[in-house]
Amino acid sequence: MEAVAVAAAVGVLLLAGAGGAAGDEAREAAAVRALVARLLGPGPAADFSVSVERALAAKPGLDTYSLGGGGAARVRVRGSTGVAAAAGLHRYLRDFCGCHVAWSGSQLRLPRPLPAVPGELTEATPNRYRYYQNVCTQSYSFVWWDWARWEREIDWMALNGINLALAWSGQEAIWQRVYLALGLTQAEINEFFTGPAFLAWGRMGNLHTWDGPLPPSWHIKQLYLQHRVLDQMRSFGMTPVLPAFAGHVPEAVTRVFPQVNVTKMGSWGHFNCSYSCSFLLAPEDPIFPIIGSLFLRELIKEFGTDHIYGADTFNEMQPPSSEPSYLAAATTAVYEAMTAVDTEAVWLLQGWLFQHQPQFWGPAQIRAVLGAVPRGRLLVLDLFAESQPVYTRTASFQGQPFIWCMLHNFGGNHGLFGALEAVNGGPEAARLFPNSTMVGTGMAPEGISQNEVVYSLMAELGWRKDPVPDLAAWVTSFAARRYGVSHPDAGAAWRLLLRSVYNCSGEACRGHNRSPLVRRPSLQMNTSIWYNRSDVFEAWRLLLTSAPSLATSPAFRYDLLDLTRQAVQELVSLYYEEARSAYLSKELASLLRAGGVLAYELLPALDEVLASDSRFLLGSWLEQARAAAVSEAEADFYEQNSRYQLTLWGPEGNILDYANKQLAGLVANYYTPRWRLFLEALVDSVAQGIPFQQHQFDKNVFQLEQAFVLSKQRYPSQPRGDTVDLAKKIFLKYYPRWVAGSW
């Protein structure tokens, strides 16, 4: 591939979402000033001046910020866009003031006077885009959010330099208008949509119907929310990505148009065709462009556009044909439905399909898709590039621009995990790849509010031209900023975590918590890990040692709880291994001892310490869902949606425990009863001399799991107990056993 062709493709894309007029500069500057006031308060905000100047960018499309002043003068923050100015503000707060902004909270103690910036500090991003989100994030993390929570997230996005992000709320209301216009009945539409917690997979054609329908109030509230989200994103100069038609239609379309050419796709995620097996329009069917253009026209009429659209036709679904001609036609149909309405359309495609089913997506099939859209009009997300990059085996996506993304988290699971070395070096390697068409970096987790160190690093890399030279020094500074003070034991704890849980490498690294703690028990559970458990326990000890100095820091208390949770997760694996070994050896006394500690001491202790922090409460999680409702019946429905997603995921445990969380209440009333039932079954097996029957246990435990989902029990949404005291209590009981190797 010639470098000229690559440059031309990237050049076309750089036109998308390019900076606007002087009026936009003023609006973006005002948005950043408002952010400063929200973040720091009106008093400290007066010490900052903010301006947006397009001419500041050294090259078109490359965001640039400049910092100056401070000391006796106001701090000057200038940016080529609002996002650039916000990123510059964050740089000043982070590197000059030692502040920290994160999902779990912020540490914003400003030095007085404000530190002066030596001379003028100017920084330009090496790439056009810093992308954020995954289609699944909309369901695993955002689904129940109100405007206040969205406003905080958009502030976080701006501070971290995000300038390209999905904005997919409210689309079902638009689809409802389109389907009604096509002749579907309201009942048919209601039957098609999933419940709120599963909309991400309805939007990608994986599911329909499951745990629906959507109440009318849902559409109204989501439309309102989408308008506010879009207004706020655009006020910073971000480019929102709107949805487009990917080809999936309700079955009822075949009633209205009996001659329509559709293919019934295969099942997905162990669901049967009552909830899966979507209908995909043939690309040559004349109704394809009609539906696609109807939807996009109505969407743009409602929300406006920034000309980048997301659509995923074959997400985790095998296409009806592997013939390159079919795949090219299917791709062309989606793209032409966009350009029929918006001649400037750029298609944002999640590259997950190429990674997820490599046995289907051979070179010819990949070329067919990538070559069916003009170069520069398809923007591919290399979604899991930190672990399994696709650009390296597709010649940089055959010349189409791509964004190097860190996926990191699956299902919104809790669990300390990261591949920081791979993340640190990945973007530079992609930029230096022969004839690279990389145009950005991205964060694409399925769920957020976990492992914040990973996202701090990735956000920083979006503005760096090279990797962080010393990750150990970087993580030590991260801890000092996070807690507001440097502490040797806390820094040492973080360096141990860096070399252990945050040092996963190789293709086996998937950010999915498969710990026995959060899985349906069996005798075949995998307890293998990529790190030395000693590092986790020693980091735990060091963090507790620093508690007398750091316990007033909310971030420290959060991290201490999270590390205690991780230590208990390790202990559960160890006691499980002992119980399994005792069962296989038919040693009843050892089985009773190990199983008793696991199910009757360790798990209750975990639930108790989790209950000390509102961010680890099932009650808080479910209250979000209930608060989105306008009636008690709706609140019950939304809560059940949320319970299903956390546990069974489908009516029969179809994707069981995929979205597992470690929350107080969930541990006590879901994970603990499962473990007790399992261990009691093992004890009965040994005592009576009969084999343990996994299939019978699965039937029995499903009754417990389903009962939890259908339960109306309410859980506290306010924390109780002191995190430090409870963590110390667990530590003093189990750490000596770990050191002695006595279980």
Swiss-Prot record:
- Keywords, comma-separated and alphabetical: Charcot-Marie-Tooth disease, Disease variant, Glycoprotein, Glycosidase, Hydrolase, Lysosome, Mucopolysaccharidosis, Neurodegeneration, Neuropathy, Signal
- GO terms under cellular component: extracellular exosome; lysosomal lumen; lysosome; membrane
User: What does the UniProt entry list as the effect of changing residue 130 to C?
Assistant: In MPS3B; does not yield active enzyme
User: According to the lineage, what is the superkingdom?
Assistant: Eukaryota
Q: Quick one: a GO biological-process term for this protein?
A: glycosaminoglycan metabolic process
Please list which residues make up the signal peptide: 1-23
**Localisation per UniProt entry:** Lysosome
Give the EC number(s) listed in the UniProt record: 3.2.1.50
Effect recorded for residue 412 to E: In MPS3B; does not yield active enzyme
Effect seen on changing residue 77 to G: In MPS3B; decreases the enzyme activity markedly
Recorded consequence of changing residue 501 to G: In MPS3B; no enzyme activity; synthesizes a polypeptide with a molecular size similar to that of the wild-type
Q: Principal localization?
A: other
According to UniProt, the tissues expressing it are described as:
Liver, ovary, peripheral blood leukocytes, testis, prostate, spleen, colon, lung, placenta and kidney.
List the catalytic activities from the record: Hydrolysis of terminal non-reducing N-acetyl-D-glucosamine residues in N-acetyl-alpha-D-glucosaminides
Methyltransferase is among the record's keywords: no
**A Gene Ontology molecular-function term?**
alpha-N-acetylglucosaminidase activity
* Impact when changing residue 446 to K: In MPS3B; no enzyme activity
Q: According to the UniProt record, what happens if one changes residue 82 to D?
A: In MPS3B; no enzyme activity; synthesizes a polypeptide with a molecular size similar to that of the wild-type
What's this protein's function? Involved in the degradation of heparan sulfate.
What's the subunit arrangement here?
A: Monomer and homodimer.
**What disease does the Swiss-Prot or TrEMBL record associate with this chain?**
Mucopolysaccharidosis 3B: A form of mucopolysaccharidosis type 3, an autosomal recessive lysosomal storage disease due to impaired degradation of heparan sulfate. MPS3 is characterized by severe central nervous system degeneration, but only mild somatic disease. Onset of clinical features usually occurs between 2 and 6 years; severe neurologic degeneration occurs in most patients between 6 and 10 years of age, and death occurs typically during the second or third decade of life. Charcot-Marie-Tooth disease, axonal, type 2V: An axonal form of Charcot-Marie-Tooth disease, a disorder of the peripheral nervous system, characterized by progressive weakness and atrophy, initially of the peroneal muscles and later of the distal muscles of the arms. Charcot-Marie-Tooth disease is classified in two main groups on the basis of electrophysiologic properties and histopathology: primary peripheral demyelinating neuropathies (designated CMT1 when they are dominantly inherited) and primary peripheral axonal neuropathies (CMT2).
Give the matching PANTHER family: ALPHA-N-ACETYLGLUCOSAMINIDASE
Q: What is this protein called?
A: Alpha-N-acetylglucosaminidase
Organism in which the protein naturally occurs = Homo sapiens
Taxonomy, top ranks, is:
Eukaryota, Metazoa, Chordata, Craniata, Vertebrata
